[in-house]
Amino acid sequence: MRQLISSENTMQKTSFRNHYVKRFSSRQASKSRKENQPKRVVLFNKPYDVLPQFTDEAGRRTLKDFIPVQGVYAAGRLDRDSEGLLVLTNDGALQARLTQPGKRTGKIYYVQVEGIPDNAALQALRTGVTLNDGPTLPAGIEIVAEPDWLWPRTPPIRERKNIPTSWLKVTLYEGRNHQVRRMTAHVGHPTLRLIRYSMGDYTLNGLDNGQWCEIAQEKDR
């Protein structure tokens, strides 16, 4: 009986070990395939009212309606109501570099807000404001003219009569949900329109609204 128990234990251990080796080998093979895949980077000028994903059960417009490239995913999000640069890639290291706060990668937005922020509001945005998920990092904030390269939005924004609007150039080094909108609302100037212009070295230059392009990725970028 003692020998039978020992034999069963040996079989169980051997079976477990073989199962572990198979699972480990499968993971290694999958990882190897991913590492051997060519790195792809797609830049997309996302229109208003397009979801930053490839599928949607509700039938709304998604990236699939514009981009035929498979196996790439957005580095960070860009709200359905926001426009501009979306970087899509299959390179996990690049995604981390563009999105993780610790990497301090700058992202530039052009933001139309209600009203004209005074110096106190601008300085608050520059030094950081406290939102419901904590204080924001210092940001670059400038009042600028409406960009001359900007396309018309469809539908246009809803402006209130007798209330002026202004444009801000905002540079962030972090990325929280709806962060720019929450920041401007916090200082009393709701965002009316938001366009992301750049993420790190990637920009909208040369991309019309709704247009995408694939670029070569440098090995040591």
Curated annotation (Swiss-Prot):
Q: What is this protein called?
A: Ribosomal large subunit pseudouridine synthase E
Q: Which CDD domains match?
A: PseudoU_synth_RluE (cd02566)
BP GO terms, sorted: pseudouridine synthesis; rRNA processing
Matching entries from InterPro entries are given as: PsdUridine_s_RsuA/RluB/E/F_cat (IPR042092), PsdUridine_synth_cat_dom_sf (IPR020103), PsdUridine_synth_RsuA/RluA (IPR006145), PsdUridine_synth_RsuA/RluB/E/F (IPR000748), PsdUridine_synth_RsuA/RluB_CS (IPR018496), RsuA_PseudoU_synthase (IPR050343), TruA/RsuA/RluB/E/F_N (IPR020094)
Give the organism, scientific name.
Answer: Salmonella typhi
Family of the protein in this entry: Belongs to the pseudouridine synthase RsuA family.
Which GO terms of the molecular function aspect are on file?
23S rRNA pseudouridine(2457) synthase activity; RNA binding
- What catalytic activity does the UniProt entry give for this protein? uridine(2457) in 23S rRNA = pseudouridine(2457) in 23S rRNA
Provide the alphabetized UniProt keywords: Isomerase, rRNA processing
The record's section on Pfam families has: PseudoU_synth_2 (PF00849)
Q: Which domain of life is it from?
A: Bacteria
Asked if the record carries the keyword tRNA-binding, the reply is: no
Which catalytic residues are annotated?
79 (nucleophile)
**Role noted for this protein:** Responsible for synthesis of pseudouridine from uracil-2457 in 23S ribosomal RNA.
Q: Does the keyword Hydrolase apply?
A: no
UniProt EC number: 5.4.99.20
